[in-house]
Amino acid sequence: MIYRIFGRFLPVFAGVLGIVLGLAAFSSTLSADQHGGATTEHGKWIEAVKATGVFFSARYRFEHVDDKGFTKNANAHTIQTHLGYKSDIHYGVSGLIELENVEAIGSGDYNSTTNGRTNFPTVADPENSEINRVHLSYHNIPDTVVTVGRQRLVLDNARFVGDVGFRQNQQTFDALTVANSSLPDLGLAYVYVKQILRIFGDDN
């Protein structure tokens, strides 16, 4: 099931995972040497894995639409899955990669905007597989985090800028973000967005 959904992304995921784990193990070794500690090869990798994390989530969603403009009702059964890896901070840098898949369950009696079933009302949850997030963050500036790459952006209550979290295909942004928290009770952010990956998927 996982390979069928994420198969074409697994080489990318494995490559990024290997690089991040290698940097984590090297960082752990350097830290141990600087503090006069001794760490075995096995211990270095265990320490690296503990400091980082693979994550997985799945969300089933059902939406029914009764629209008087159509002779048929829409019934959309979909499942969203995320598979990702988030690193700890090493040399001031952390990284994240996340794959996303949206699958229709059953007959797909709804217009997803990409499936051609225009005789049904619209439920904007098209089937899609993509790299949802992949970014690096720099943490060595006091009270500041600089993030570059594909990322989630949710400002305030997400009314104007957000991830459209109630839909299955999450909206993400290819962007540069500088977030500063040096002032009490005030957060400052500069965001440059190159591209918006909308909820309608790659085919729309």
How would you label these PLM feature ranges?
Residues 1, 83, 188-190:
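Intrinsically disordered, low-complexity segments enriched in small/polar residues
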Residues 1-40, 44:
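Cleavable N-terminal export/targeting peptides
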Residues 8, 16-19, 23, 37-38, ...:
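Intrinsically disordered, low-complexity regions
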Residues 28-153, 176-181:
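Beta-barrel outer-membrane channel/assembly domains of diderm bacteria
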Residues 31-38, 142-146, 165-204:
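Signature for the C-terminal beta-barrel architecture of outer-membrane proteins
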Residues 58-62, 148-153, 159-163, 188-195:
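Transmembrane beta-strand segments that form the barrel wall of outer-membrane beta-barrel proteins
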Residues 66-72, 108-113, 157-166, 198-204:
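Outer-membrane beta-barrel translocator domains and adjoining extracellular loop/strand segments
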Residues 116-121, 156-164, 171-173:
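Short acidic, glycine/Ser/Thr-rich loop/turn "cap" segments at secondary-structure junctions
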